[in-house]
């Protein structure tokens, strides 16, 4: 499967669920306590990280999505620390404060990268608190495309059926990270993401691949889910939908260091991808890759777009390349330059790709390590070439270009010239075909001012899109 990142900045997501603070006390240990047979840890580092549903929201924000976070907190210093933690990364908290309950806190003591003990500070929230939270969250549905219910069985999400039904009626997808043995609580959800233990707690022991699929499809029918994504640790993920063959995605983790928050990463990457316009198989592949990154980190962690681009390139070869948005390309270009790669850029309409184009692009690629092709969108081609053009729509033109071995990235632009996009990207070498003077090439002055170069390459004589069109018309 070819995997490319959607424009995450377009994603609008609401996360509702059990928010908590993950607190870490870290230090060396060199002796056993005289009071009891336990190690003595000399704490020299204290760190607070948003956890649970808050970690889901942070993952979405780190990927570039717009996210609101609804949850239950106490009237305490921990709630203040949690608020600061999420606001720092642009998450908009929508707390419901319960004065007589503490904000959930999980304190972990670590030494030499090993967790020695975990201490939980929490009290169960009342069912009435959950009802109030979900009712408060209904007002946010009109401003989002996807809702994530992040359930840690702490009381924030007790009976969400009515909330799910309302969201679906408004055209909002609902993704659920489930907890407990009653998946019927989430009836009507678009997608649920149980891990294997959670799945077997509901359906019983899975004895084979066929058994897994049969039981998953049974849940789809019973609870009116659109899809189930079962996360299976070292076996990857299995996506089961009602009307399509199952999809198995193998794990991409290189080294498992800490699985804390891996489920949060999966559902956050799914939500961000789907809200940004990715289809479900693509979103699952992106989520699988994100999970492979996060398990290589210590503690509750997030995955950035840069890390995801690098991981996709590593595990999928062409992933992270091909047809990309301008923002995706800016990130990829930054990483290419950090790796010391020489980036070449050219542009054009490329309406009917012909041998002259192929030869020209091959020459351009030979001048560096990576080649960007910026393509005029349909409206700008029509303005430049007149009625009847383009012959091929921009998505088809870009797909053909992306299939060439010489081309690494293809990006559209809407202006009559590529001046703006070239000025933003600033390649090492800007190439143009034809008989242009260097000073007349759009973006050339800016590239040179930034330390880059501009070069003109020749086209093959007698081959042009216009000539091809005229020949076709003459032979009709």
Swiss-Prot record:
Q: Where is this region: Cytidylyltransferase?
A: 345-476
Q: Which reaction does it catalyse?
A: D-glycero-beta-D-manno-heptose 7-phosphate + ATP = D-glycero-beta-D-manno-heptose 1,7-bisphosphate + ADP + H(+); D-glycero-beta-D-manno-heptose 1-phosphate + ATP + H(+) = ADP-D-glycero-beta-D-manno-heptose + diphosphate
Q: In which pathway does it act?
A: Nucleotide-sugar biosynthesis; ADP-L-glycero-beta-D-manno-heptose biosynthesis; ADP-L-glycero-beta-D-manno-heptose from D-glycero-beta-D-manno-heptose 7-phosphate: step 1/4; Nucleotide-sugar biosynthesis; ADP-L-glycero-beta-D-manno-heptose biosynthesis; ADP-L-glycero-beta-D-manno-heptose from D-glycero-beta-D-manno-heptose 7-phosphate: step 3/4
Q: Which UniProt keywords apply?
A: ATP-binding, Carbohydrate metabolism, Kinase, Multifunctional enzyme, Nucleotide-binding, Nucleotidyltransferase, Transferase
What GO terms describe the biological role, i.e. biological process, of this protein? ADP-L-glycero-beta-D-manno-heptose biosynthetic process
Which residues of this protein are catalytic? Answer: 264
* Highest taxon of the lineage: Bacteria
- Key word Kinase present: yes
Q: Which Pfam families match?
A: CTP_transf_like, PfkB
Can you list the GO cellular component terms from the UniProt entry? cytosol
What is known about what this protein does? Catalyzes the ADP transfer from ATP to D-glycero-beta-D-manno-heptose 1-phosphate, yielding ADP-D-glycero-beta-D-manno-heptose.
Subunit structure of this entry?
Homodimer.
Name it. Bifunctional protein HldE
């Amino acid at each position: 499967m070819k995997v490319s990142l959607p424009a995450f900045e377009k994603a609008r997501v609401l996360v509702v669920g059990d928010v908590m603070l993950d607190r870490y006390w870290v230090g060396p240990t060199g002796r056993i306590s005289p009071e009891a047979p336990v190690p003595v840890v000399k704490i020299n580092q204290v760190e607070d990280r948003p956890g649970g549903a808050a970690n889901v929201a942070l993952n979405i924000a780190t990927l570039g999505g717009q996210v609101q976070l609804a949850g239950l907190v106490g009237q305490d210093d921990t709630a203040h620390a949690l608020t600061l933690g999420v606001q720092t990364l642009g998450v908009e908290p929508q707390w419901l404060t319960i004065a007589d309950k503490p904000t959930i806190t999980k304190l972990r003591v670590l030494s030499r990268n090993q967790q020695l003990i975990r201490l939980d500070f929490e009290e169960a929230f009342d069912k009435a608190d959950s009802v109030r939270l979900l009712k408060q969250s209904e007002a946010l549905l009109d401003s989002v495309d996807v809702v994530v219910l992040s359930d840690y069985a702490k009381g924030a999400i007790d009976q969400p059926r009515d909330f799910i039904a309302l969201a679906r009626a408004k055209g909002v997808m609902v993704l659920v990270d489930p907890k407990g043995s009653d998946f019927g609580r989430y009836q009507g959800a678009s997608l649920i993401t149980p891990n294997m233990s959670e799945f077997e707690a509901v359906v019983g022991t899975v004895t084979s691949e066929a058994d897994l699929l049969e039981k998953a499809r049974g849940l789809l029918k019973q609870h009116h889910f659109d899809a189930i994504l079962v996360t299976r640790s070292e076996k990857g993920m299995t996506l089961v939908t009602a009307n399509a063959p199952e999809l198995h995605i193998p794990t991409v983790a290189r080294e498992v260091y800490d699985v804390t928050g891996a489920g949060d990463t999966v559902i956050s990457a799914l939500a961000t991808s789907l809200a940004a316009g990715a289809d479900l198989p693509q979103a699952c592949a992106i989520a699988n890759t994100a999970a492979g990154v996060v398990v290589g980190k210590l503690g509750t962690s997030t995955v950035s777009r840069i890390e995801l681009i690098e991981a996709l390139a590593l595990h999928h070869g062409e992933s992270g390349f091909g047809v990309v948005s301008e923002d995706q390309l800016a990130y990829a270009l930054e990483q290419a330059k950090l790796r010391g790669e020489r980036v070449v850029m050219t542009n054009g309409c490329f309406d009917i790709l012909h041998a002259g184009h192929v030869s020209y692009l091959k020459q351009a690629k030979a001048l560096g390590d990576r080649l960007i092709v910026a393509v005029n969108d349909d409206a700008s081609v029509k303005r430049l070439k007149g009625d009847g053009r383009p012959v091929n729509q921009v998505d088809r033109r870009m797909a053909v270009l992306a299939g060439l071995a010489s081309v690494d990235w293809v990006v559209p632009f809407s202006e009559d010239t590529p001046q703006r996009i070239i000025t933003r990207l600033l390649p090492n070498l800007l190439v143009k075909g034809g008989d242009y003077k260097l000073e007349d090439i759009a973006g050339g002055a800016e590239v040179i001012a930034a330390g880059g170069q501009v070069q003109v390459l020749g086209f093959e004589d007698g081959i042009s899109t216009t000539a091809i069109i005229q020949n076709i018309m003459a032979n009709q």
